Amino acid sequence: MNILLSRFRLLLAAALAALSWGAQAQLSIEITGAGATRFPVAIPLFENEGSLPRGITDVVRADLERSGLFSLVDMGLVTLPATAVPDLAGVRARGADAVLAGSLYPQADGRYDVRFRLFDTQKQTELGGLSLRMTPAQNRATAHRIADFVYEKLTGQPGYFATRIAYVVKSGPRYELQIADADGMNAQTALASREPIISPAWAPDGQRLAYVSFEAKKPVVYVHTLATGQRHVVANFKGSNSAPTWAPDGQRLAVVLTKDGQSQLYVLNADGSGLRRMATSPGIDTEPAWSPDGEWIYFSSDRGGSAQIYRIPASGGSAQRVTFEGNYNVTPRLSPDGRSLAFITRNNGRFQVAVMDLATRQTTILTDSSRDESPSFAPNGRMILYATESGGRGVLAAVSSDGRVKQRLSVQAADVREPSWGPLTR
């Protein structure tokens, strides 16, 4: 049997596997590996934080610790208000190279003004600060923005804590497309169905998802606007309609159709118009991924006799082979800067996440598990979210692009698959 066709059937079979799922259950995150060198930072309580029903700084601390790049210096019950310069030498003596000072100011409308400043204790300088307005219910969203600020100031890269992830879970005959914060909290159901849901893909605006639903008793591609719940059919041609991926302009999608026989790549507008076939191949072409500059579409194909990754100009033209090591490399996903390619490779019989430097063509295997699938880069390119198996059930995991930081995200007694990491939207 054709190896890519076999893979498609295996993925569909995995989507049909049933384990119990509690609606609105949260993903729990276990840190299984951290960076070799972590930056020591202190995040004491904000002034007046006790007036909130739920805190802020505990979420900031959890975000930074989860990244694997920071170690937290305990400040006890010390409160450092945003209006004063803290004793930086004293904080430095506790072992922190940076410290965050903040205050909450209640407003007449029930909201809070949150002000904070970040200091470098070594150089005895202020690194910057912000003022944010929030309701008490927005404590977690505000905390994620603060953590992003700290992350960017101390690493030079944008943070990813205020982003969202999409994934699919299974409960008996019920499938749910879930949306959650990057830390697994605030999970919401975007779509529930008694038929499989696969291949969620975020639009660049972070407001829409494309996915494949089998509710019509066949795979059909939909685009779903999350704020309104409205959705429309993008591809419902004869045969299979699958593997949607957005162009960087947010106006077009690449999809895989079998309407003319084998699985082949097509591009069409997000409203379903303007269908254009990308190439003609005697084999199976599938799993497209657009490059961030919009110039290339990467995809999996067996056209050369084994499952490998190719790319084709988005404007049309001849395909070029990208992977050459091994005889099974599939599911290409480009880093946000376009410099790296994440994919699934078969290594000694194990399916693992690998990353290729597209300039040097050097490939590094990042995981040590055996049934990985569906890699998805964080919007800053630092982490890669993917699906794997643990204890006989599907879980999500994340690994840093250098392989040093590792996390596992799971739901108690639930099967979780098909992850997709949303874009930065601020």
From Swiss-Prot:
Biological process terms in GO annotation: cell division; protein import
Main subcellular location: periplasm
A Pfam family that the UniProt record links to this protein: PD40
Key words, A-Z: Cell cycle, Cell division, Periplasm, Signal
Listed transmembrane segments: none
Purpose: Part of the Tol-Pal system, which plays a role in outer membrane invagination during cell division and is important for maintaining outer membrane integrity.
Subunit structure: The Tol-Pal system is composed of five core proteins: the inner membrane proteins TolA, TolQ and TolR, the periplasmic protein TolB and the outer membrane protein Pal. They form a network linking the inner and outer membranes and the peptidoglycan layer.
Designated name of the protein: Tol-Pal system protein TolB
Organism: Aromatoleum aromaticum (strain DSM 19018 / LMG 30748 / EbN1)
Gene this chain is encoded by: tolB
